[in-house]
Amino acid sequence: MSRYRGPRLKKIRRLGALPGLTRKTPKSGSNLKKKFHSGKKEQYRIRLQEKQKLRFHYGLTERQLLRYVHIAGKAKRSTGQVLLQLLEMRLDNILFRLGMASTIPGARQLVNHRHILVNGRIVNIPSFRCKPRDIITTKDNQRSKGLVQTLMASSDPGKLPKHLTIDTLEYKGLVNKILDRKWVGLKINELLVVEYYSRQT
């Protein structure tokens, strides 16, 4: 299944706020949960909804998300928590959380077009897994810096998660540590996502 490129407002009306996909927010009363019926179908739809929220927020294909679930399942810690950490430490998401891009698709474009450096080296893979002490910067040219300048200047430092640090003068971000669960940028029940996939096998 390919990455979603359709109307974004349609998705947030069904699934709720997806800050990684769009800055728009759904109107109250538009959530899919109100359409549910009782029984097993309701439980399946709830699990499906949480899975879809995760997929669309982080801009993943079904195959990509399934691969992350498999990797998380091999860890000795909570599968759901490891899954969220894997997704949050992707380079495209780190750029989004740092305020260097307004959405994750926007961050992915920056990476694909070779505007972003990690520890001084160009990285053009959006799924690149960042780690503690990684330094994220733009290329040292006017065009690359211009793409993030306005966004970084208008970003709210108070909303920056504690595992990240930003230097708006140097157009530079620092990964301090692996994030804690409470700093995940999406309202999600990751256990339902894990349960969804466990019932597919």
From Swiss-Prot:
SMART domains, per the entry: Ribosomal_S4, S4
Localization in the cell: Plastid, Chloroplast
GO biological process, one term: ribosomal small subunit biogenesis
Keyword Ribosomal protein: yes
InterPro entries the UniProt entry points to: Ribosomal_uS4, Ribosomal_uS4_bac-type, Ribosomal_uS4_CS, Ribosomal_uS4_N, S4_RNA-bd, S4_RNA-bd_sf
Principal location class: plastid
One cellular component term from this protein's GO annotations in UniProt: chloroplast
Domain S4 RNA-binding: start-end pairs: 89-157
Region (Disordered): 16-36
GO molecular function, one term: structural constituent of ribosome
Keyword DNA damage: no
Keyword field: Chloroplast, Plastid, Ribonucleoprotein, Ribosomal protein, RNA-binding, rRNA-binding
Entry function: One of the primary rRNA binding proteins, it binds directly to 16S rRNA where it nucleates assembly of the body of the 30S subunit. With S5 and S12 plays an important role in translational accuracy.
Subunit structure, as described in the record: Part of the 30S ribosomal subunit. Contacts protein S5. The interaction surface between S4 and S5 is involved in control of translational fidelity.
NCBIfam families: PRK05327.1, rpsD_bact
Family according to the record: Belongs to the universal ribosomal protein uS4 family.
Protein name: Small ribosomal subunit protein uS4c
Organism: Lolium perenne
Lineage of origin: Eukaryota, Viridiplantae, Streptophyta, Embryophyta, Tracheophyta
